[in-house]
């Protein structure tokens, strides 16, 4: 698993943010219970896995798209597709 600080710097993941902001920046964002899951793409070289998963959690009582969320877990860039990245995020 990647550290939060490294993910923010390398993958340019915002922290804190809102679900609305994530959805405008990334194409694969899902609400899953009280968590927000993200599958992201980061070019890792020809023939290399280029997808990662990330998990955000609500930081306040506002569960709308404008509530504040914080980054809780990020995988390494290790998946060959976004489905496997989301599967990783679900298991966190």
Which residues fall in each region the model found?
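A short, exposed loop/beta-hairpin motif centered on an aromatic-Gly-Thr core
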Residues: 66-82
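Small side chains
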Residues: 7, 39-40, 53-54, 67-70, ...
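Amphipathic, interaction-prone secondary-structure segments
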Residues: 22-58
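Negatively charged, low-complexity tracts enriched in Asp/Glu with abundant Ser/Thr
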Residues: 1-35
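Generic "edge-of-domain/loop-turn" microfeature
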Residues: 18, 60-62, 84
């Amino acid at each position: 698993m990647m550290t939060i600080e490294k993910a923010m710097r390398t993958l340019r993941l915002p922290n804190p943010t809102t679900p609305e902001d994530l959805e405008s920046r990334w194409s694969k964002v899902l609400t899953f219970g009280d968590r927000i899951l993200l599958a992201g793409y980061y070019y890792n070289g020809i023939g290399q896995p280029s997808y990662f998963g990330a998990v955000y959690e609500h930081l306040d009582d506002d569960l709308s798209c404008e509530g504040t969320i914080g980054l809780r877990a990020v995988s390494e860039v290790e998946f060959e597709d976004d489905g496997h990245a989301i599967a990783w995020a679900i298991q966190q």
